Amino acid sequence: MTSCHVAEDPIKKVAIFGGTHGNELTGVFLVKHWLENSTEIQRTGLEVKPFITNPRAVKKCTRYIDCDLNRVFDPENLGKKKSEDLPYEVRRAQEINHLFGPKDSEDSYDIIFDLHNTTSNMGCTLILEDSRNDFLIQMFHYIKTSLAPLPCYVYLIEHPSLKYATTRSIAKYPVGIEVGPQPQGVLRADILDQMRKMIQHALDFIHNFNEGKEFPPCAIEVYKIMRKVDYPRNESGEISAIIHPKLQDQDWKPLHPEDPVFLTLDGKTIPLGGDQTVYPVFVNEAAYYEKKEAFAKTTKLTLNANSIRSSLH
């Protein structure tokens, strides 16, 4: 681990997004609460803006209206000429980019926390998009340490061919927060409490950083996406096997080549196959049936961060 020191600009503008998917209710309810009473998210010298990203989907308690808002923040969609013919979420993405971006510009918000729920048994999860970002690795280390002994996992979605174009990607530092298991359209007090604590610790980290605290070199364990796995299908393209009981709810646990992953209605077990141990995430996620994803394979690795402190101190 290197001990090189990195001076970062202080953080000034932070947004907390809820309702990117309108049926993931923890973020929706927290953001609505903070819009009425923002006391617990305020920190000295920091602008923190709670924001409902997909109000139409929230109103209907559905994931989206026309298309997934969390996949359209790419140059092509953000650059499309404004028109009522555009999908609602593309128009909304352009509005959000105007309010909190523009993406890849000096004017964009410093940090966006995007709050999500999953039906998978993933517990507290932080989603990282850049494995070389000292600031975010330090923040995630702080959150993980603060939450202990409650586990908090880091999912690294850096991949050469899987492009996400997430809602939060317009910020200089995008942070995905994913907490589960929670059914769509349902609120659970334990899940809400965990997400609330993750935001509190994240804001405390930013406050400490802005106040001049130096964070020494650190390392975190992350799970990096390898590939997404579809369900077995018949000639008509319909699902022909379901998640095996021994895989269900086993997110983040080691999965070996001989381990069962699918079960047919005839009772046939289908093993993982391949030649390496992987770590499954988003196992049997309800929202991913339409995306043809039964689970994602990840590999476990360690990321190191240099020490950081604010350039003002």
From Swiss-Prot:
Residue positions of the active site: E178
InterPro entries (UniProt xref): AspA/AstE_fam, Aspartoacylase, AstE_AspA_cat, Aste_AspA_hybrid_dom
Note on how the cofactor is bound: Binds 1 zinc ion per subunit.
Site note Transition state stabilizer, residues: R63
Cofactor: Zn(2+)
Keyword Nucleus part of the UniProt annotation: yes
GO cellular-component term (any): nucleus
UniProt entry keywords in alphabetical sequence: Cytoplasm, Hydrolase, Metal-binding, Nucleus, Zinc
PANTHER family to which the protein is assigned, alphabetical: ASPARTOACYLASE
Family: Belongs to the AspA/AstE family. Aspartoacylase subfamily.
Protein name: Aspartoacylase
Annotated source species: Bos taurus
